[in-house]
């Protein structure tokens, strides 16, 4: 009873000390971290449902812990389904979080930004605004280079009529993310490269649930790619495997991440 009361008291104190912008999950983790004497590494992820699906940030923390990282990853996120960079710029919470101060800030764009002109224009216009608003202790913000949809999605009439398929979309994603990274001084996280490697070398592993959103395997792959860049090292030593994923599939996904460049 006393332990539960103490945990509740600590959570309330943290809520006032670290600000009401923090999510419930982040506050619970910070309460638990009071018993962890490793130095903290604060990470903010600004993104969409691709990030909150299967609680990818929690996977990232578990991956880091299982790999014996010397830091405890304290991860906060501002994520909304279908959110564009323009959407995030209009969100008071996102802007307040960016201004709080972090060791790392990760920007994960809308999945369809490169499928239409206005979406790509907003991506290139508001990405730099978010990056400039990020208060970092050192380094620069990071941009997730995400995966294109599954091939079947491009059979829709508008895509088919324009001759816009998966390979064209992937190429445009790479080009526009490279441009934004150059314009806004961002590091790029090579999720797309790991995704393609896993998709081609292990086609039996289902990475999406609907052609877009990640399965548990897809979220694990995404989190591994993020960790590989944050730690600037291989993920072969990661032992964490999420529920619902076999050890063999998890090993194959770790190998896919280690087979592609971490830095772009």
Label each PLM-derived region with a short phrase.
Residues 29-32, 91-93, 174-175:
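A generic local structural motif
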């Amino acid at each position: 009873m006393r332990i539960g009361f103490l945990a509740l008291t600590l959570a309330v104190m943290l809520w006032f000390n670290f600000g009401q912008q923090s999510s419930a999950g982040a506050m619970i983790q910070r309460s638990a971290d009071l018993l962890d004497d490793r130095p903290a590494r604060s990470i903010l992820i600004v993104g969409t449902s691709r990030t909150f699906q299967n609680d990818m940030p929690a996977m990232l923390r578990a991956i880091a812990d299982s790999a014996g990282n010397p830091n405890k990853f304290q991860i906060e996120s501002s994520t909304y389904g279908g959110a564009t960079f323009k959407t995030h710029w209009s969100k008071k919470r996102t802007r307040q979080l960016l201004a709080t101060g972090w060791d790392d800030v990760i920007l994960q764009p809308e999945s369809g930004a490169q499928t239409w002109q206005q979406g790509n224009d907003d991506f290139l216009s508001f990405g730099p605004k978010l990056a400039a608003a990020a208060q970092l202790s050192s380094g620069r913000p990071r941009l997730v280079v995400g995966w294109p949809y599954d091939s079947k999605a491009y059979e829709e009439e508008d895509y088919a009529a324009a001759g816009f398929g998966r390979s064209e979309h992937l190429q445009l994603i790479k080009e526009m993310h490279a441009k934004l990274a150059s314009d806004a001084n961002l590091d790029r996280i090579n999720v797309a490269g790991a995704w393609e490697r896993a998709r081609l070398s292990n086609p039996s592993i289902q990475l999406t649930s609907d052609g877009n959103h990640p399965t548990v395997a897809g979220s694990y792959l995404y989190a591994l790619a993020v960790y590989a860049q944050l730690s600037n090292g291989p993920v072969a030593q990661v032992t964490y495997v999420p529920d619902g994923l076999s050890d063999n599939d998890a090993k194959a996904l770790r190998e896919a991440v280690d087979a592609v460049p971490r830095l772009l």
